[in-house]
Amino acid sequence: MSEFLNTHNASILLSAVNKSHYPQDDLPEIALAGRSNVGKSSFINTLLGRKNLARTSSKPGKTQSLNFYNIDDKLRFVDVPGYGYAKVSKKERAKWGKMIEEYLTSRENLRAVVSLVDFRHDPSSDDVQMYDFLKYYEIPVILVATKADKVPRGKWNKQESAIKKKLDFDSNDAFIIFSSVDRTGLDTSWDAILESL
C-alpha cells in the first residue's frame, strides 16, 4: 500500500451539495456511506492515520454535504451524509437523498462504495436499502462492519452471518470486520479499496 500511496498526505479538499461543486478531474473516488454515528469519521481518520481530519461528532447527522478528501493526489474519499437520523426534517432528508443519489448514480470518478454497518447490531432498514440501491446500480461495494472491538471475538462468526443474511449479501463483495480502536481490518480495508481503483 505505502509504495503506491502516502496515506498521511491527506487533506479535506471541498464540500459539495451538487454536481457543479464536484472536483473537475479524473482522480478515482471511493465513497463512504453509512448510518449516522456508524463510525464513518473514525474509519476515515484510522485509514489515514490522522486524529481529526474527518471531524467526529456526538451529534449524528452533522455531515450535510459531500466532503471530498484528497489522498496523496492519487485518490479521493467522498464522505456521504449519514442516513437514518430521525431528528432531521423529512424535507432535509429528501434533499440529502437526492444529493447522494445524484452523486452515486452519475459520478464517473466513483470506483466503489464503502458501505459501513455497525457490527454490534443487525443492519437497519436504511442499511438494507443502501445495499440494495448499490447492487441495483451495479456499484462495487466494500462492506465494513465497524465497532468490532465492542463485540466479543467468540460472537464474530454469528454476527457476520446475521448481517450477511439480513442484507442478502453478495459473496463477491468484500466483507471487512473493522475497529478504529484496535485497528482490526485496517490493512484489509486498504487492500479492498486499492483493488477497486
UniProtKB/Swiss-Prot annotation:
Start and end residues of each EngB-type G domain: 26-197
Annotated Gene Ontology cellular component terms: cytosol
Protein origin, superkingdom: Bacteria
Binding site for GTP: 34-41, 61-65, 79-82, 146-149, 178-180
GO biological process, one term: division septum assembly
Molecular function as annotated in GO: GTP binding; metal ion binding
GTP-binding among keywords: yes
CDD domains cross-referenced by the UniProt entry: YihA_EngB
Transmembrane domains' residue ranges: none
Binding residue positions for Mg(2+): 41, 63
Required co-factors: Mg(2+)
The protein's name: Probable GTP-binding protein EngB
Naturally occurring in which organism (per UniProt): Streptococcus mutans serotype c (strain ATCC 700610 / UA159)
